[in-house]
């Protein structure tokens, strides 16, 4: 038998749960104010694109998707999936380092492949950039990646030092 909460009580119950989950020593202002910084080094992609290279929110850094372009250009490296995957991961490392981070700080990656049949080939290259324990990861097939790329990877990193 399932029971439902009367509609009039829902706001009160939600407010109680949210208040109960707030740390006792955290002032409300601190919860509402998190530093947000938009980061653009120009070391991988040109600063003229309509998105940030990365965004730092508190100690979390969200990297925009990277493809296998030669740094400072909008040209994919030649050599297909293996070359693009290597350059993509090199670009991620360069972007992280430009903002005081490393691949060891990465906690999540999202991998988009133009052809899921290249998943195993990508994994071989990916594994050479990380050591266990590996970041959490999702991989999906995607049609129409930027610049006709074979692979695009976006990452989330946790900074070990405050902003």
Description of each model-found segment:
Residues 1-10:
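Bacterial N-terminal signal peptides that target proteins for export
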Residues 10-13, 17-90, 94-99, 104-107, ...:
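N-terminal presequence-like segments and the immediate start of the first folded domain
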